[in-house]
Amino acid sequence: MKKILFLFVLGFGLIAFSACTSNPANQEAPIGENSNNPVDTAINNEVAPVLIDGSYVVDVNASQMTWHASRVVASDHTGLIQIKNGNLDVSEGNLMGANFIIDMNSISSDEGLDALVGHLKSEDFFDVANYPEAFLEINNVTYLDGAYQITADLGIKGAVSSITFPAQITTEADRLLATAAFSIDRTVWDIRYGSGKFFEDLGDKTIKDEIDFTIQLEAQRQ
């Protein structure tokens, strides 16, 4: 679990997704479909670092995405998810847009819990048989309080919703490095298993709705 972060984090009972999301749109969307609308890039009275212009391709072997989820009582789980591919565009020194495909079938457990991994892949959670990929598409970038503020569409299980999170992004020669962290409310993406919002009398088997993700990205300029 490694370098430029746009994480994505997911969990047991998985499951926790802290409401950074808005406008849930339970609409089927082609995985990783890019919109043709230009990304809104604004620099709010702060001078953003000047990035090196170019098209960057994510180095999936040098990048890492982690997830963390827990029950309401005493049970925390963490693991990795593989970024399948990704692209970032920098123009006039600013990040103009990016998109990433996430391999949901690659979900793993740091504890090596095969039963947990199997459950996360099942229909109760990510239903990877029918939805093997998720996507993150950046459509708005601002710079505030020493960090890039990223707004992106996150697609999981055919549902798409907007999330906003801070990120650190730098370029060095032909490399782009990024780190990010965000939380989501999994129920927005119709992942309801063990949620106290939808089921009563779960007691200590209740799984938190929030899932935390971290991303460390490294990308190569083409």
How should each PLM-predicted stretch be described?
Residues 6-14:
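Hydrophobic helical h-region of N-terminal Sec-dependent signal peptides
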Residues 20-222:
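Low-complexity, acidic/polar, glycine-enriched regions of mature
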